[in-house]
Curated annotation (Swiss-Prot):
Name of protein: Agropine synthesis reductase
InterPro entries: His_Pase_superF_clade-1, His_PPase_superfam, Mas1, NAD(P)-bd_dom_sf, Sc_DH/Rdtase_CS, SDR_fam
Gene source species: Rhizobium rhizogenes (Agrobacterium rhizogenes)
Gene name of this polypeptide: mas1
Active-site annotation: 346 (proton acceptor)
EC numbers for this chain: 1.-.-.-
Role description: Reduces deoxy-fructosyl-glutamine to mannopine.
Length: 430
């Protein structure tokens, strides 16, 4: 429900305000509390007089917001002095050197009602023992003057956000007012607009263990929203905990194309977009040219290492093109660049995977899609346990690959690297 003119009183936005960003703090326990009193819904009351920190959900929301904000041209950060706002700004790790606290960005003061529950009218109008709405609106308008410097970021509260929007004549939806949302207010002609910025959505196949698990953990820690596909969803729950608004699980069988289509459909239904695909699932079974070849085993390896990445790329490509900066990361191998053994199945399929990467790059380039082969040598996982050429301590570690994957996702379109060869032992350069 929009704030009324009566609520605002004489408050007006400064005339010289430029485009700016707004981040509502992450959730606290009070944000999640509701009760019914005589059939009327009451919400948890936390205003200027309630100085509590974020709960675990709120901390995660701050991490997600940070992923977005670090890519935006933030010129300065102006923050409410309340703990929940400061925690949000710190956890988001925005990386802006200009940081300021402004008391005028505090939430409205709800007096003796702080920490309890209140009806809707407490938040919508002047209510006994609460801060006068006109005075509240006037101090918010005063704080808004910081946006005379373009691309200022305000880190504040829901009530402050609603006043800001009302001062600028912008209508907010529930999605705009959710905790942890990054909003971009733009001065248009003739009116202001507001846009939501959310962290990218990345799909990873085979993330239950090894390299895939390290990649998923790394991206989650850096504020990406994730859709994870594995044969057994319970393995994902064991590895990453329950699903949430930013974490999605799906059944993925690299030998069953139907599971791939269902996964992509479910991910889009949940998040509304796909920004990146990481084809990680692979098969390293030793199909040996020096022995009788098991062609059933070879065809299985071909399907897992080549057909499944192709199908996933085909399914995701339309959504990746929509973003203007879609990413496809194929976890390849140095075995896709050179040959050191008779394992013809693995060597062939990894060379073929490189062909998929190049074709994806060719097809998607003009729509902003970039594809990369990440080609490690021996990685300290179960797949490399057979070799005695190098000790596990001297092998590439899974998180080394995870860091390279994240760098590939975040690298700009204008300076893309299509292949990364990762070595842990002396080899000739091809």
């Amino acid at each position: 429900m929009p704030i009324s003119l009566e609520y605002l009183g004489p408050a007006q936005a400064p005339a010289s305000v430029g485009d700016f960003y707004f981040l509502r703090h992450g959730k606290t326990d009070l944000n999640e509390k509701e009760v019914f009193v005589q059939g009327e819904k009451h919400w948890g009351v936390q205003g200027a007089g309630t100085n509590i920190g974020l709960n675990e959900t709120g901390k995660r929301q701050a991490v997600l917001a940070g992923n977005v904000l670090r890519k935006l041209p933030i010129s300065s950060v102006v923050c409410s002095p309340l703990l929940r706002a400061i925690q949000t700004a710190v956890i988001a790790n925005i990386g802006c050197l200009c940081f300021e606290i402004d008391d005028d960005l505090k939430e409205r003061d709800f007096g003796k009602h702080e920490g309890g529950y209140g009806p809707l009218k407490m938040f919508e109008e002047n209510y006994p023992d609460t801060e006068n709405t006109e005075l509240f609106s006037m101090r918010v308008a005063k704080a808004l003057a910081h946006a005379e410097t373009e691309n200022t970021l305000f880190v504040s509260h829901g009530g402050v956000l609603r006043v800001v929007a009302a001062l600028l004549g912008v209508e907010l939806t529930k999605e705009h007012t959710d905790n942890g949302r990054v909003l971009h207010f733009r001065r248009g002609c003739p009116q202001w607009t507001v846009e939501i910025h959310q962290s990218p959505v990345i799909l990873i196949s085979g993330p239950s263990r090894g390299i895939g698990k390290a990649i998923a953990e790394n991206l989650i820690a850096h504020g990406y929203r994730m859709s994870l596909g594995a044969r057994r969803v319970k393995d994902l729950e064991s590895a990453f905990g329950p699903q949430s608004e930013w974490l999605h699980y799906a059944r993925f069988d690299a030998e069953d194309n139907d599971t791939m289509a269902a996964w992509v459909t479910a991910a889009v239904e949940k998040f509304g977009r796909i920004d990146g695909l990481i084809n990680n699932a692979g098969c390293g079974e030793p199909v040996n040219l020096e022995k009788d070849i098991d062609y059933k085993q070879f065809h299985r390896q071909w399907h897992i290492n080549c057909v499944a990445p192709l199908r996933m790329t085909e399914l995701c490509l339309p959504y990746l093109c929509e973003t203007g900066s879609g990413r496809v990361v194929n976890i390849n191998s140095m075995s896709g660049q050179r040959v050191l053994n008779p394992f013809v199945g693995y060597n062939m399929t990894k060379h073929a995977l490189g062909g998929l990467t190049k074709t994806t790059q060719h097809v998607g380039w003009d729509r902003g899609v970039r594809a990369i082969d990440i080609c490690p040598g021996f990685v300290a996982t179960e797949m490399s346990a057979w070799t005695d050429l190098i000790s596990s301590n001297d092998m590439i570690q899974p998180n080394d690959i995870a860091n390279l994957v994240r760098e590939a996702i975040e690298r700009p379109n204008r300076a893309y690297v299509p292949r990364s060869e990762v070595m842990c032992m002396k080899e000739s350069i091809h």
